[in-house]
Amino acid sequence: MSEEQFGGDGAAAAATAAVGGSAGEQEGAMVAAAQGAAAAAGSGSGGGSAPGGTEGGSTEAEGAKIDASKNEEDEGHSNSSPRHTEAATAQREEWKMFIGGLSWDTTKKDLKDYFSKFGDVVDCTLKLDPITGRSRGFGFVLFKESESVDKVMDQKEHKLNGKVIDPKRAKAMKTKEPVKKIFVGGLSPDTPEEKIREYFGGFGEVESIELPMDNKTNKRRGFCFITFKEEEPVKKIMEKKYHNVGLSKCEIKVAMSKEQYQQQQQWGSRGGFAGRARGRGGGPSQNWNQGYSNYWNQGYGSYGYNSQGYGGYGGYDYTGYNSYYGYGDYSNQQSGYGKVSRRGGHQNSYKPY
């Protein structure tokens, strides 16, 4: 917590830090306050940096108040303490559940009311289709205590709104995969690869360029994918939505792997450049990844999401783009992805974000 956030005079700040800590931490905070009396006597916020209470006491207090820490997260605040971050991530991993197989008619209230019988529900969310507003058939529940998750898992079958649902423990990824790939839409098929490389090479070293081909005409399509060596060029490029490449005004979007896309979807996105491409905060504050392949590779399986063109390289299928990503302008052919003219790199399944 920064000095400005801590606020108040030094003595009050030290006392506040001491409240949330253990006896040892309280004593440490008081000693620190006494040693910093000169600083505490001033009107500045610097007196609130008592080491004994800030790190230990604040971590315990905020860790115990789930809803408070989540609100801070929603508002974009972050705690720079690695100890705080690791503890909060570990606790959320124990408190959070993925709920699959939901009825299309199930509401957030239904979800919360059902799982409240297992313990205090701090928050819950349903994942909705951004175009239709319809439920995707799955969501997440955050409990106040990990014991509630155990109770849910101990029950063999769960039914909600007349349908058997599929609750699972949520799993947190330890690292965030950097985004190094972009989608370039509205590109003239006649634009030479050299011209594309020259323009985007001005932002950073280009690792590979994918030039998709129509599998019927064997001609290039009006878009491409570019992978950079580092993540920084993507951040620079995403500062503008449109770029002039050759004679074309191109729309740029972040291309994300399946795993990256899953991370972004868990509990929404906050902060980071990827989300700005969608017009809201992006970049996962908690990198949640369920690892439940049946909800992804089969288009969310029984959740009826095949129509969105989600699986494998079909993520580039333009049936999916038209109905979900709104890329109709780049979809003159409705025939999946076809051949890809590619220079360097390896093939992977990506999605524009």
Swiss-Prot record:
GO BP: 3'-UTR-mediated mRNA destabilization; cellular response to amino acid stimulus; cellular response to estradiol stimulus; cellular response to nitric oxide; cellular response to putrescine; cerebellum development; circadian regulation of translation; CRD-mediated mRNA stabilization
Regions of compositional bias (Gly residues) in chain numbering: 43-56
Family matches, as PROSITE patterns: RRM (PS50102)
Modified residues (N-acetylserine): S2
Localization of this protein: Nucleus; Cytoplasm
Keyword Lyase carried by entry: no
Keyword hit for Repressor: no
Molecular functions (GO terms): chromatin binding; histone deacetylase binding; minor groove of adenine-thymine-rich DNA binding; mRNA 3'-UTR AU-rich region binding; mRNA binding; RNA binding; telomeric DNA binding
Cross-link for Glycyl lysine isopeptide (Lys-Gly) (interchain with G-Cter in SUMO2), residue positions: K70, K127, K195
Domain of life of the native organism: Eukaryota
Record PTM N6-methyllysine, positions in chain: K117
Listed Gene3D superfamilies: 3.30.70.330
Start and end residues of each RRM domain: 95-177, 180-259
Residue ranges the record marks as coiled coil: none
Pfam families: CBFNT, RRM_1
Record PTM Phosphoserine, positions in chain: S69, S78, S80, S81, S188, S269
Residues bearing PTM N6-acetyllysine: K163, K241, K249
Function field: Binds with high affinity to RNA molecules that contain AU-rich elements (AREs) found within the 3'-UTR of many proto-oncogenes and cytokine mRNAs. Also binds to double- and single-stranded DNA sequences in a specific manner and functions a transcription factor. Each of the RNA-binding domains specifically can bind solely to a single-stranded non-monotonous 5'-UUAG-3' sequence and also weaker to the single-stranded 5'-TTAGGG-3' telomeric DNA repeat. Binds RNA oligonucleotides with 5'-UUAGGG-3' repeats more tightly than the telomeric single-stranded DNA 5'-TTAGGG-3' repeats.
Subunit structure, interactors included: Identified in a IGF2BP1-dependent mRNP granule complex containing untranslated mRNAs. Part of a complex associated with the FOS mCRD domain and consisting of PABPC1, PAIP1, CSDE1/UNR and SYNCRIP. Interacts with IGF2BP2. Interacts with GTPBP1. Interacts with EIF4G1; the interaction requires RNA. Interacts with EIF3B and RPS3.
PANTHER family: HETEROGENEOUS NUCLEAR RIBONUCLEOPROTEIN D0, RNA-BINDING (RRM/RBD/RNP MOTIFS) FAMILY PROTEIN
Protein name: Heterogeneous nuclear ribonucleoprotein D0
